């Protein structure tokens, strides 16, 4: 959607969801730095993000969702209900205590997702977002083609450059090639912590 720059306000989430479902790419504030995202089941939009950022396709991409319960049919382990409860509760407690978002690496039934989300890995990186507006946006993205409400979330920058921290910096990177959500982030100082769901190891 090159040449279709648009700035959405916080009260236009339905329009934002429609834009994303039509294949648009969006820069938006997250818990810390700005993110760059799209509907996680639109492979053309995902490839546009990878090309815009000059990102290694093997790295995979983080996705956001609004609640752990969305993942029930996706997670590829036994006792999934107790694990999902743990994910939700631990995420909430961790964010409250550390003022830092938490991204999980979880085993999945990979055949149901675009392979580019996983890259060269065997797990999906998923964050149960604590940003109120992004929670609402993920919910608005739920559809027959995206039953999990997944929103791609990669840092808003060119590969190896400093992530954007405000609208002006985001527009400086991508100009009229994408759209923007003009609202506030949560102001966390650090990027999300990354934790392996099964092994329990913190990787970042």
Swiss-Prot record:
Entries under Pfam families matching the protein: Sua5_yciO_yrdC (PF01300)
Entry keyword set: ATP-binding, Cytoplasm, Nucleotide-binding, Nucleotidyltransferase, Transferase, tRNA processing
EC number of this enzyme: 2.7.7.87
Record-linked InterPro entries: DHBP_synth_RibB-like_a/b_dom, Sua5-like_dom, TC-AMP_synthase, TC-AMP_synthase_SUA5
Enzyme class per UniProt: transferase
Localization per Swiss-Prot or TrEMBL: Cytoplasm
GO cellular component: cytoplasm
Segments forming a coiled coil: none
Any single biological process term in GO: tRNA threonylcarbamoyladenosine modification
Top-level taxonomic group: Bacteria
Positions of the YrdC-like domain: 10-204
One MF annotation (Gene Ontology) recorded for this entry: L-threonylcarbamoyladenylate synthase
Reaction(s) this enzyme catalyzes, per UniProt: L-threonine + hydrogencarbonate + ATP = L-threonylcarbamoyladenylate + diphosphate + H2O
Record function comment: Required for the formation of a threonylcarbamoyl group on adenosine at position 37 (t(6)A37) in tRNAs that read codons beginning with adenine. Catalyzes the conversion of L-threonine, HCO(3)(-)/CO(2) and ATP to give threonylcarbamoyl-AMP (TC-AMP) as the acyladenylate intermediate, with the release of diphosphate.
Annotated family: Belongs to the SUA5 family. TsaC subfamily.
HAMAP family the UniProt entry points to: TsaC
Official protein name in the record: Threonylcarbamoyl-AMP synthase
UniProt source species: Moraxella catarrhalis (strain BBH18)
